Amino acid sequence: MAGSAAKKRGRGKSPLDLGKLKRAMEDCARDCERPLNIDLVIDVTAGDELINCLLEALRTQDPRTQLRCMLLAGELPELPAPCDLCVVAGGESLAVGEVLALAEGLPAPAVLVIEEGETFFAQTPEQAAELVGGSCAPDGSRTPAPVPLDAIVAVDLAASEPLAELGEWVARCAGEARLALAQRYPFCREQVARELVRKTALLNAGVGVLVMMPGADMPVITLNQAKMVVQIAGIYGQPLDLSRLREVAAVVAGAFGLRGVARELADALPGLGWGVKGAVAYSGTVAMGRAAIDCFSEGGTLNSLGAAITRAAEQLATQAQPGTGPAQ
């Protein structure tokens, strides 16, 4: 029954604007293909394991990406512009904060990476934030200039994915370069994809709550979901040439059942319809995004994603039936 109900909800004219979808695909392809200049500044007192881990993660044969390595030993290195990401491997030097300040002045997103639990200049990001940065006076004292805590990442080199926290930082803070970074570097790919899903789901929840005219929210929600799918496809290496426009549109069509659930529940609960629409817009977008991540991370294509999203729509429809709840 849930399957047939989802299919009925999927019928009708698509609210997706193909012209806007075309522009979204062009924008995503451009963002994914952009050249990258990445600076790795290595404090000479940093641990060998940390240095090797960062070098292995950031090296790439991709001709669109240039990795520039430099040492922090006494004098501050010169950071050439443009720079899309500056990673500082921290050791015992307190001058790493000044390197971050130089990078931010380019401007470029900059992060200090330290080993979790190691006794260098700090054992935690909180201690590092209090210590690093500032300038040396003639008497050798330092002028306090703490680095923001969100610019420091502590990594566990014994973990199965030691740079997972760095990947989370890239997803939050790398700005316009994050799609290209995620496409070329596996350590941050899933984190960037999940952040795209989170932001799109929150955006669509707001649309569902605020747009009260029946059906007026559908084109906006649909386009946001299409953009999300396109971006996730791009960072997982799916081709985004315009010959795939119809494929993307067909994939998004598989999510009409997700959006239909919101309409049905809003009609059934008129007093709470605005809240239900927002909640289901959020849940439907999350389900769609997770299906895309799972599909592409396992080597799937846009063609196979359509079936996965249809299954997600049917599952959400089943959970929304009276007397049922979310699957455990």
How would you describe each model-predicted region?
Residues G175-V192, L196:
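Active-site helix-to-loop segments that bind/position phosphate- or nucleotide-bearing substrates
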Residues G3-L72, R290:
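Conserved G1/Walker A P-loop phosphate-binding module
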Residues L50, L67-L72, T119-A180:
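Canonical P-loop GTPase G-domain recognition
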Residues V276-Q328:
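Charge-biased C-terminal accessory regions appended to nucleic-acid-, cytoskeletal NTPase
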Residues R194-R290:
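Membrane-inserting effector segments that mediate pore formation, membrane fusion
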Residues A95-A108:
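Amphipathic helical hotspot of TIR/SEFIR-family domains
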Residues L40-A46, V87-S93, I114-G117:
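Structural motif
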